[in-house]
Regions:
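Gly/Ser/Thr-rich phosphate-binding loop
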Residues: 237-240, 247-307
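Conserved ATP-binding/catalytic segment of the ANL
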Residues: 304-333
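Conserved AMP-binding/adenylate-forming
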Residues: 74-77, 92-134, 214-224
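N-lobe entry segment of adenylate-forming
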Residues: 2-96, 149, 161-179
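Conserved pre-ATP/AMP-binding loop-to-beta segment of ANL
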Residues: 29, 33-34, 65, 69-70, ...
């Protein structure tokens, strides 16, 4: 008799476990469908529109071939080839301390140029970068499984100087792979390589950027806007970073182009205002028009965005379940 009851209790627990797993699978599938629907615009599906490069790793490689001897950072006297070499050395150093491709790496706090080099070194390995901003590493480790912490005892330049500038890639990330996990918002924002590339491409088209343009931008290191406008944009467009006599400036205020986060006032933005929605990677509209392959609707209490720059989702699927609706992503004011 005891055996009978134990058997049926175990059988019931097994059925409950299988049922919960099945429901979880259905929810995951439903959320993925919602996110994919939000990332489509018209009949153009995400990744169907080809960006010039298939990943951030390929971006740095391709731009170095195009602009190898061109100055990339006049402040630090660094050419595109110098930058590329630093990135390769960084990847070799990361590999030497046990970092593996596909891992998530928590970015340490570094100054702008070192952060930019480390970020591309992480991408070059096929890893994803975590920006914790005001969150403690302990807090991140509680929420992210197997997040790797990188610590430096001296400057990045001193740390990597003995490593080879030839790096053999063990993993080449796909456009759809995660490139960034940012905790700029408590819920955690996931961005793919495609998100980053398509958003920067949209900014380039909207502003009409030309290579060799002297450019300056001074944003908070580690913010999503810093990643897009200060870390990637100069590399993507072949710009020259210069704070003495820039031809183009981008910043929070008083610049040629100003970043505006107050989306409830988007209808009143000036022609040189860039509407920022970090759930849409960064740029949403410039000069009153949505950037290429992005669109939005104004709601009473927020904005619904859709298009190829729409993020991979929040870290928490329960939030995704609510936020992704009606073939879009709702962001509250």
């Amino acid at each position: 008799m005891t055996y009978y009851f134990v058997y049926h209790r175990v059988q019931k627990q097994l059925i409950n476990f299988q049922l919960k797993s099945f429901i979880g699978f259905i929810m995951k599938t439903d959320i993925k469908t919602k996110i994919y629907s939000a990332q489509c615009i018209g009949n153009v599906e995400p990744i169907e529109y080809m960006t010039p490069y298939p990943s951030m790793r390929s971006l740095i490689e391709g731009q170095t071939i195009k602009f190898s001897d061109q100055m990339m950072n006049e402040i630090s006297n660094i050419t595109n080839q110098n930058f590329f070499d630093f990135v390769m050395q960084t990847s070799n150093w990361l590999q030497s301390i046990g970092i593996e491709p596909k891992q998530r790496i928590i970015m340490p706090e570094l100054e702008y140029l070192e952060s930019q080099i480390l970020l591309f070194g992480i991408w070059n390995m096929g890893c994803s970068a975590i920006f914790n901003l005001d969150h403690s590493i302990e807090n991140i480790n509680e929420r992210v499984v197997d997040a790797q912490t990188v610590r430096l005892n001296e400057s990045l330049f001193n740390t990597i100087k003995t490593y080879s500038n030839k790096y053999l890639a063990r993993h080449k990330p796909l456009l759809s792979d995660e490139a960034i996990l940012s905790f700029e918002k408590e819920s955690g924002i996931r961005l793919s390589h495609y998100n980053l590339l398509i958003n920067v491409n949209g900014i380039e088209k909207a502003i009409g950027l030309k290579n060799k343009t002297r450019f300056h931008c001074d944003l908070r290191t580690g913010s999503i806007c810093w990643i897009i406008f200060q870390a990637i944009l100069p590399v993507h467009c072949g710009l020259i970073y210069n704070n003495k006599n820039p031809e183009l400036t981008i910043g929070e205020s008083g610049k040629d182009y100003n970043l505006r986060h107050d989306l409830n006032n988007i209808s009143k933005f000036s022609s040189n205002d860039i509407a920022i929605c970090i759930e849409n990677t960064a740029a949403l509209s410039i000069n009153g028009k949505p950037i290429h392959l992005s669109d939005y609707d104004i709601l009473d209490d927020g904005i619904r965005v859709r298009g190829h720059s729409v993020m991979m989702g929040y870290l928490d699927d329960e939030i995704n379940e609510v936020a992704f609706e009606n073939s879009g992503l709702k962001v509250s004011f």
